[in-house]
Amino acid sequence: MAVNVNTNVSAMTAQRYLNGASNAQQTSMERLSSGFKINSAKDDAAGLQISNRLNVQSRGLDVAVRNANDGISIAQTAEGAMNETTNILQRMRDLSLQSANGSNSKADRVAIQEEVTALNDELNRIAETTSFGGNKLLNGTFETKSFQIGADNGEAVMLSLNNMRSDNAMMGGTSYQAANGKDKDWSVQAGSNDLQITLKDTSGTDQTINISAKEGDDIEELATYINGQTDMVKASVDDEGKLQVFAGSNKVEGPVTFAGGLAGELGMQAGQAVTVDVIDVTSVGGAQESVAIVDAALQFVDSHRAQLGAFQNRFSHAISNLDNINENVSASKSRIKDTDFAKETTALTKSQILSQASSSVLAQAKQAPQAALSLLG
């Protein structure tokens, strides 16, 4: 083996391995201290890009879950208020039925009307004050809003909240009154016993209701025939013996027309819009029609509550799906970017041992040129 002074190859080799061990030791310490095995693009350029995309998706999913939970909270708030609206309407219906009873005096009905008026005021107060985050929910100003329930654009769901005030057209319908009242002595006559009621339902389909009363039937029996033929309209008789027909906005679209011999004899007039806001139970006829008006309002409220229930269930399933996606995305990101501490600790120990060994060998290699001095003796 040649003895060289100018070039110490052994020392250079030991130095190279020492540098490599030091670099590996530094990398392991960085990974262990940060918790990430990819800390810069030089560690894994492709892995860094993939993990960043997964991180963006994961954060977007977290926001989407929060958005969906906000949507559920809004729906729950509105549905809770509508539950109380339902209770109020049911009480108003009870009072209408009570007032329609013949045992009540005028003073009794006036007292009942006072409670109906107070309940109407409370119904409107609920509609005007129910809010979430400063947004009014039930007074008609919320309209339709979108809820972003996905990590990317375009993944939105629409929520509509209707006006629950008592003067909303959907909280009632149209009332058709006969011009001619019929007393207890009136009865249906042969040749003039037919009545055709033509209307269009909310799906746009034309409907015709044909009534054939029997000779000798009175006005109350005629109303019973109408109610027995369809639930699209509700018929009753007021205090003056006038037939009144109510068509709820939740079932009938547009005007109702009357034809036939009975229509001419009764003198059915043009319809008047009526809502819960204007119900009057101070008369038997008004109380009876109030029942039909409140029934239409209850169906409208219940229908909207059902929609909110479906919305909440949909969002609950959406949240479960988002959580599942986020779990898998986070797991994938972790496999790519996160440090395997068991593996990295082993690598650190290895690099530390190699560093110590390289340092020892380098020290010995530096002593090799001293042999040249001994030869010069």
From Swiss-Prot:
GO cellular component, one term: extracellular region
Coiled coil: 104-128
Pfam families per UniProt: Flagellin_C, Flagellin_IN, Flagellin_N
A molecular function GO annotation: structural molecule activity
Alphabetical UniProt keywords: Bacterial flagellum, Coiled coil, Secreted, Virulence
Keyword Secreted: yes
UniProt main location, coarse: secreted
Superkingdom in the source lineage: Bacteria
InterPro entries recorded: Flagellin, Flagellin_C, Flagellin_C_sub2, Flagellin_hook_IN_motif, Flagellin_N
Protein family according to the UniProt entry: Belongs to the bacterial flagellin family.
Function: Flagellin is the subunit protein which polymerizes to form the filaments of bacterial flagella. FlaD is not essential for flagellar synthesis and motility. May have a role in virulence unrelated to motility.
Subunit structure: Heteromer of multiple flagellin subunits including FlaA, FlaB, FlaC, FlaD and possibly FlaE.
Protein name in UniProt: Flagellin D
Name of the gene encoding the protein in the UniProt record: flaD
